[in-house]
């Protein structure tokens, strides 16, 4: 798989920290936007139709048993004005099991998943990160190793099994990385790195975290020509001792993009109500909440239409003095939910669906309370823009986003 996307950087001299898997081609606000990021990820796997080393004879209800050995490579390269910002390469080896129960429940267990992540940064990009004095951002762009165990549960209830109109889908996963390694290193009294205070494998720090994500969907068929689709996604990741500043970049949550909160570019929303006054990098978080609703209907022949509303955001799990408003608070998070709406055209060619969605931001949580909705005055925000040396470089608050994709967003 692969993708091209536009991730422009907007830089201003005001550095006051107290200022408030469908295949996709990333959203962009105009056809003149340049693609500056390339990403591809080949994968090979060997599937054996049984659970190796496990006796399944006493389990009557399981079927479709599989043992999977896989190897994958993910490469990402981003440019800034034709110059390299960074390259990231991820090599992963996985050994896992999968099986079904009663043709409704799918279980996937990966006892061993080993990844090596190498980041090559330009000197200019590294200087920009260091100048921000942001430990979370710096931790996201460092070399590391991930030794993880994963479990995934999928429940699928087709419409034919209940009233013929409503179907449900639930996808939950949990992942633990580095915890066994960290415990082993402690028990065996291994030395820590003198500079970082962390344990390392062959000179590379290993990540330590726990992470879970839950995806619940409901599809309601109104008639043969129209239906509703709903989705709710929640996720939480907690970085732990050996890499405690942040989750690894590739394991972090993000908002925006072609199948999330479509009125924002991928990784341009959040975290929380934090307003980035110095530079727009990839915005990532450790807490994710998202809800989507679509009304899908036939138009003409192979053309279908959709009206949709997206809501969501990301947050940090802990308070960050450099990012006020970025942490998740029970008494504050509801007001920090971004909301967008739009319409889409889908070309249904049976073997795949080509999708074009146009989304408009209705509520922007990076603004102060009283200015977040599109119809509210923007006095404080306009004052803020006047403090910047290059205010025209800041993207517009309510610019429609055009998204292209293959397949439904959910």
State the predicted function of each range.
Residues 51, 345-354, 409:
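Metal-dependent nuclease catalytic cores in nucleic-acid-processing enzymes
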Residues 305-308, 353-359:
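Conserved active-site loop/cleft motifs that coordinate metal ions or position small ligands
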């Amino acid at each position: 798989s692969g993708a091209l996307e536009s991730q422009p950087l907007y830089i201003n001299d005001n550095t006051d920290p107290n200022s408030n898997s469908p295949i996709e081609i990333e959203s962009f606000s105009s056809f003149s936007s340049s693609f500056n990021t390339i990403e591809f990820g080949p994968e090979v796997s060997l599937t054996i139709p049984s659970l190796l080393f496990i006796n399944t004879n006493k389990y009557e209800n399981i079927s479709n048993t599989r043992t999977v050995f896989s190897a994958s490579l993910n490469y990402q390269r981003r440019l800034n004005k034709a110059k390299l910002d960074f390259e990231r390469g991820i090599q992963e080896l996985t050994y896992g099991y999968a099986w079904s129960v009663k043709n409704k429940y799918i279980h996937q267990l990966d006892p061993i998943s080993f990844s090596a992540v190498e980041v090559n940064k330009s000197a200019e990009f590294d200087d920009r990160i260091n100048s921000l004095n942001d430990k979370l951002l710096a931790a996201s762009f460092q070399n590391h190793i991930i030794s993880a165990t994963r479990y995934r549960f999928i429940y699928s209830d087709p419409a034919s099994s209940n009233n013929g109109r409503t179907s449900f889908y639930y996808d939950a996963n949990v992942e633990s990385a580095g915890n066994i390694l960290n415990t082993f290193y402690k028990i065996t009294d291994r030395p820590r790195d003198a500079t970082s205070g962390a344990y390392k494998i062959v000179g590379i720090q290993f990540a330590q975290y726990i992470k879970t994500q839950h995806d619940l969907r409901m599809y309601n068929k109104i008639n043969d020509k129209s239906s509703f689709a709903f989705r709710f996604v929640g996720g939480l990741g907690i970085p732990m001792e050996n890499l405690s500043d942040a989750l690894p970049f590739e394991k972090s949550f993000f908002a925006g993009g072609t199948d999330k909160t479509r009125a924002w570019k991928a990784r341009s929303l959040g975290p929380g109500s934090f307003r980035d006054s110095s530079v727009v990098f990839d915005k990532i978080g450790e807490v994710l909440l998202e809800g989507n609703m679509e009304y899908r209907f036939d138009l003409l022949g192979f053309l279908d239409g959709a009206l949709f509303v997206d809501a969501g955001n990301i947050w940090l799990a802990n308070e960050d003095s450099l990012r006020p408003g970025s942490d998740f608070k029970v008494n504050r998070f509801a007001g920090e939910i971004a909301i967008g709406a739009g319409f889409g055209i889908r070309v249904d060619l049976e073997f795949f669906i080509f999708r074009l969605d146009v989304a408009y931001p209705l509520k922007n949580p990076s603004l102060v309370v009283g200015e977040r909705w599109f119809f509210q005055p923007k006095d404080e925000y306009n004052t803020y823009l006047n403090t910047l040396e290059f205010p025209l470089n800041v993207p517009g608050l309510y610019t429609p986003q055009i998204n292209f994709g293959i397949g439904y967003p959910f």
